[in-house]
């Protein structure tokens, strides 16, 4: 038979953000059905579960009215109430309670109290959690807090995404990087090799031509493949600052109209979706589409500047955009981006990064050197 007392030795349950938090009371309930007392069930669940905080935005730290949970999961509310009572024996700080004075159930609070690990997803993000957003919990459980910087799979975002670049790399450094990303450092030996640099430039040019063809076929937009491809692809949110990019493009439009021409033509590409009820995000999309139409109708400007908004942006579209990118926009409001992974995907495919000192940009700049990333702001 099964020995549920040793569950943590055989299973690990990862709670990514607060959306799966109900696994805690539900697992306690299931263990109770199998004859395990509440106190031991809590201890088993705490050792089995770990919590990752992916963002400090309040919208992702779910708080549910007790009345909702009473109606939807009545079998779990008594367990949540017992967990709240247990948490209150550990601290008198009301702000760390699971059920607050307004009868709202804080999922993140339940996660931190009753898991064995709480981690952020970039070094800066974890420090913000410890020193600001979750400081009270850090003082209570310093041993639980740790950092695990986000990452990407090179199989998807280099080998599958950019086969031309992969083949070129293999010609010069072998295939070891397919299994060990550190092998890519061998490429540094060719930093001043004009032949290799020309080959890499040719790969980028071919990828840009392929993206131009895809945009014409799927978006019915013709772009200049010889222009600089400036890409910002991520979910539409105020803190990610697509609106800052928009204001820059409006400025560029007026500069061109005034006769101040850029050094090279620019194609600015946006890939994003807005949450269904996020009105401001939808307004930003509307503004981008309007600007795109204004520029397209002005032959004086459109020779130098184009704005493209990719509809129904998804991973398939990302696999087209990322290998063709010249300039990667990672311009979130500093302290608000927990990590980001687009910054990694674009740089892996040879794009230059323009960004703020935020999220994983901090660690990327340390890895590649400040001279190889364009950081602005505080």
Describe each model-derived feature in a short phrase.
Residues 32-78, 340-378:
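Catalytic or ion-translocation cores adjacent to nucleophile or general acid/base/metal-coordination motifs
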Residues 2-8, 31-43, 55, 59, ...:
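Secondary-structure transition/capping motifs at alpha-helix termini
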Residues 161-229:
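Extended, charge-enriched "interface" segments that sit outside catalytic cores
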Residues 136-187, 323-324, 331-378:
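Catalytic binding pocket for nucleotide-activated donors in carbohydrate/polymer assembly enzymes
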Residues 64-119, 123, 127:
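Polar, glycine-rich mid-to-C-terminal structural blocks
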Residues 18-24, 49-59, 125-128, 154-157, ...:
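Flexible loop/turn segments at secondary-structure boundaries
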């Amino acid at each position: 038979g099964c020995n549920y007392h040793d569950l943590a030795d055989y299973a690990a349950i990862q709670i990514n953000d607060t959306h799966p938090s109900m696994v805690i009371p539900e697992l306690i309930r299931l263990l109770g059905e199998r004859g395990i007392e509440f106190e031991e069930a809590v201890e088993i669940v705490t050792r089995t579960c770990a919590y990752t905080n992916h963002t400090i935005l309040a919208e992702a730290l779910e708080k549910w009215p007790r009345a909702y949970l009473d109606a939807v999961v009545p079998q779990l509310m008594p367990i949540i109430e017992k967990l709240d009572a247990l948490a209150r024996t550990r601290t008198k700080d009301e702000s760390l309670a699971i059920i607050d004075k307004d009868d709202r159930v804080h999922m993140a609070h339940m996660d931190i109290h009753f898991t064995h690990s709480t981690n952020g997803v970039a070094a800066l993000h974890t420090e913000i959690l410890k020193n600001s957003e979750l400081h009270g919990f850090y003082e209570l459980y310093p041993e639980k807090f740790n950092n695990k910087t986000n990452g990407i799979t090179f199989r998807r975002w280099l080998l599958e995404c950019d086969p031309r670049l992969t083949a070129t790399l293999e010609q010069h450094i072998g295939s070891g990087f397919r299994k060990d990303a550190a092998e890519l450092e061998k490429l540094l030996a060719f930093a001043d090799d004009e032949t290799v640099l020309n080959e890499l430039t040719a790969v980028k040019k071919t990828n840009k031509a392929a993206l131009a063809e895809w945009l014409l076929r799927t978006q019915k937009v013709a772009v200049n493949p010889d222009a600089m491809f400036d890409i910002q692809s991520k979910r539409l949110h105020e803190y990610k600052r697509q609106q800052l990019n928009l204001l820059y493009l409006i400025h560029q439009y007026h500069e061109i109209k005034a006769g101040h021409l850029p050094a090279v033509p620019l194609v600015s590409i946006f890939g994003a979706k807005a949450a269904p009820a996020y009105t401001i995000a939808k307004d930003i999309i509307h503004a981008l589409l309007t600007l795109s139409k204004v520029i397209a109708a002005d032959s004086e400007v459109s020779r130098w500047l184009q704005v493209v908004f990719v509809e129904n942006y998804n991973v398939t579209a990302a696999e087209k955009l990322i290998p063709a990118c010249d300039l990667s926009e990672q311009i979130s409001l500093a302290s608000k981006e927990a990590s980001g992974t687009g910054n990694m995907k674009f740089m892996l495919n040879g794009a230059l990064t323009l960004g703020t000192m935020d999220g994983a940009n901090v660690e990327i700049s340390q890895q590649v050197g400040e001279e190889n990333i364009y950081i602005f702001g505080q």
